[in-house]
């Protein structure tokens, strides 16, 4: 039997691999030389938010950055048009070259699921809450593909944006519960000048909808400033802003603790919103300090002169 030839890797260049086995072989070899492998999973259609994740990953000393580009069919449900999801591979690879990324993993559905989806990761009760209530099976699909990516790449760290906050919490839960030896790093949401969270889906908004979409981040900001008066005041302030834009159909607006459990009486929490504008579903969230008049852990209270708004870059 002929021995398999080593997979080629050119240091300092963008190496594009489709086969999971090739990525596994290359990252194993790189680790043996002392390189730290870090992963940025994406579904392509890269924008500044993705590039921010990549830049955060590149700051890891000695890191070789792996960016996966895979539109995962398992996380699309009924009524969600998988075929319409933007696919811009050539542009994405050009962006990765410009950022100095060394590995792009671009598998097909057949590469990732050669025998179909016989095995999947169940997210537990949180997977049926918030986003999961509107998108049954979504998080099982997300966790399954992330679990596979972590086993294929075996990264020291993997980087995810805080915009998809429930996803971030569930991935951290999975890594802990399944003893996966990867540190999950959350990166703050990247925003447009008016506060709108960057998303590949923003391209579906028309000009009027794009202007209206700024109400989501404005609502979160209003809630953040009201948080010192409690969770109910937080929700009331955010809801008042959203109510001013009738075109926004709110799916949920909730305050939870940082792990998305019940809202705390006082302390660190998360304000989350999901809404539909036209045919586009938008998500956003922000950290809030419930009932905190003097800040938490030495951080200034939101609204104080020393507090920096999250999108004042």
From Swiss-Prot:
Active site: 50 (proton donor)
Pfam families, per the entry: Pantoate_ligase
Binding positions for (R)-pantoate per the UniProt entry: 75, 167
Compartments, as annotated in UniProt: Cytoplasm
InterPro entries to which the protein is assigned, alphabetical: Pantoate_ligase, Pantoate_ligase_C, Rossmann-like_a/b/a_fold
Record field: catalytic activity: (R)-pantoate + beta-alanine + ATP = (R)-pantothenate + AMP + diphosphate + H(+)
UniProt pathway annotation: Cofactor biosynthesis; (R)-pantothenate biosynthesis; (R)-pantothenate from (R)-pantoate and beta-alanine: step 1/1
Binding site for beta-alanine: 75
Record-linked SUPFAM superfamilies: Nucleotidylyl transferase (SSF52374)
Binding, ATP: 43-50, 161-164, 190, 198-201
GO BP term (any one): pantothenate biosynthetic process
Listed GO MF terms: ATP binding; pantoate-beta-alanine ligase activity
Annotated family: Belongs to the pantothenate synthetase family.
Subunit structure: Homodimer.
Matches recorded under NCBIfam families: panC
Biological function: Catalyzes the condensation of pantoate with beta-alanine in an ATP-dependent reaction via a pantoyl-adenylate intermediate.
Remaining remarks: The reaction proceeds by a bi uni uni bi ping pong mechanism.
Protein name: Pantothenate synthetase
Source species of the chain: Mycobacterium sp. (strain KMS)
Name of the coding gene: panC
